[in-house]
């Protein structure tokens, strides 16, 4: 989408009460948006539809609503603390910072610093003491608490594999480069399902879930061709 069309879309969303720049009257906060009267209803309709099709209409999925603040050791053991990062460069000419693979044309190569890794997780402290024991993160995705609560869900529901755990919730990423309106932001919501299967049955389950999700997207008015062919080969590895 061209910059002109994006600007027109942003203006329309604000004018009709879908999305506003967060803290706009104080100059706004880059990468943060507030959903207005129509926006919150649209978002809730999408979430309710997804939850209904993923949890309520199936007998093999349980729901979860986990905490946003995440213990440091969880994200250390998951690998996020060491690898959830993007390469960052500084332009010595303009003074701006960019992802190494998204440097604008007006910055010359010789003006860039060597790339260094920038962790995308927001850090915070839990409790009144600012020391190592209180260190935590705002979760960068909704998956980790599903895994850490796996045994709790199994013990409390007597579930056996195959079954899934679904969650809708906020996630936070301190993105270096923000672009395309709400398509890359620092605070957003995810609708996530982790489905656990018996080894050797993963391909069959994958096909079933792909078809199920395509039907759901069609019910939202999105063409099956658009929702499926957008996934390129290198994007499907974790799916």
Give residue spans per PLM region:
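Surface-exposed helix-capping loop/turn segments at secondary-structure junctions
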Residues: 56-62, 219-226
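A generic structural motif
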Residues: 195-203
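Long, well-ordered alpha-helical scaffolding segments within enzyme catalytic domains
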Residues: 203-224
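Conserved small/polar residues in nucleotide/adenosyl-binding loops
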Residues: 229-236
């Amino acid at each position: 989408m061209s910059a002109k069309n994006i600007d027109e879309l942003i203006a329309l969303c604000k004018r009709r009460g879908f999305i506003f720049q967060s803290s706009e009257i104080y100059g706004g906060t880059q990468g943060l948006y507030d959903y207005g009267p129509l926006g919150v209803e649209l978002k809730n309709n999408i979430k309710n539809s997804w939850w209904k099709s993923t949890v309520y209409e199936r007998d093999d999925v349980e729901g979860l609503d986990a905490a946003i603040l995440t213990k440091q050791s969880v994200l250390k053991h998951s690998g996020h603390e060491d690898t959830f990062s993007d390469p960052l460069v500084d332009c010595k000419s303009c003074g701006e910072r960019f992802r190494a693979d998204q440097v604008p044309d007006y910055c010359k190569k010789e003006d860039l610093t060597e790339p260094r890794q920038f962790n995308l997780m927001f850090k915070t402290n839990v409790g009144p003491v600012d020391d190592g024991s209180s260190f935590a993160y705002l979760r960068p995705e909704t998956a980790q608490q599903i895994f850490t609560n796996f045994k709790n869900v199994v013990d409390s529901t007597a579930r056996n594999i195959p079954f899934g755990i679904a969650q809708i919730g906020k996630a936070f990423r301190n993105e270096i480069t923000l672009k395309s309106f709400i398509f890359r932001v620092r605070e957003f919501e995810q609708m996530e399902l982790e489905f656990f299967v018996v080894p050797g049955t993963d391909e069959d389950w994958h096909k079933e879930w792909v078809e199920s999700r395509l039907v759901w997207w069609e019910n939202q008015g999105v063409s099956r061709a658009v929702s499926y062919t957008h996934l390129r080969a290198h994007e499907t590895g974790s799916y």
